[in-house]
Amino acid sequence: MRQIIIAGNWKMNTTLSEACTLVQSMKCELERIEGIEKIICPPFISLYPIKTMLENSSIKLGAQNLFYQEKGAYTGEISPLMLKELCQYVIIGHSERRAYFGETGQVVNQKIKAALQAGLLPIVCVGEKPEENENGQTRQVLETQLKEALDGLNLSCIIIAYEPIWAIGTGKAATASEANSAIGYIRRVLGDTLGNAAAQTSPILYGGSVNEKNITEILSQTNIDGALVGGASLKAESFVSICRQAAVIQNKH
């Protein structure tokens, strides 16, 4: 069984002091949870202080975005080399980046290549809009997004997060069977794009209104290897509960 990954995406939430308080409130409990990969992705400004708080910890850090150039006249951007000193993971291609900042499949592809070049592990997000889901276009959209994102890459493993846009922040998660079916299709596309070996080793996460009440059902599905958690990752008790339930499932195998 692939190792379960639970990643908390804090989005544009928490001041510096709030971020440190949140980490402090769940650090000890999270460190007791074994067998899964635990990742928190705070805003950029909190990465360094949280890194110092998590020194020698089993909790990993991730960024929420990056730019694809190493350095230069790109006002306001953060480069892969800057992030490499602070974290291990980076979220790329989140639907909010695509919607609000115009990120295209080509840009996502450039960012993935830049992250890998710097030694960062990308968490690549894909997912369909509400109208695409209603029109039966989910598979077509996922295939297009994946092939654009992975164009020109020869990888043995890549982390993918399936986040149906209609489920993000709405409280309306995809049913476990819907998520499992979509992720099964993603794995098939990975097989066509990167080869069967990569498809079998690549963890595929589900994201979209994940909470402590639905995580066990989600992770009990055959194709789902973890979760990208939004709002629930901002509550220490909820995030710890999600990780604890994930570890129970992991340790059964």
Curated annotation (Swiss-Prot):
Cleavable signal peptide: none
Superkingdom of the organism of origin: Bacteria
Pathway in which the depicted protein is active: Carbohydrate biosynthesis; gluconeogenesis; Carbohydrate degradation; glycolysis; D-glyceraldehyde 3-phosphate from glycerone phosphate: step 1/1
SUPFAM superfamilies for the chain: Triosephosphate isomerase (TIM)
GO biological process: gluconeogenesis; glyceraldehyde-3-phosphate biosynthetic process; glycerol catabolic process; glycolytic process
GO-annotated cellular components: cytosol
Main location: cytoplasm
Active site: 94 (electrophile), 163 (proton acceptor)
Biological role stated in the UniProt entry: Involved in the gluconeogenesis. Catalyzes stereospecifically the conversion of dihydroxyacetone phosphate (DHAP) to D-glyceraldehyde-3-phosphate (G3P).
Protein's UniProt name: Triosephosphate isomerase
Record organism: Dehalococcoides mccartyi (strain ATCC BAA-2100 / JCM 16839 / KCTC 5957 / BAV1)
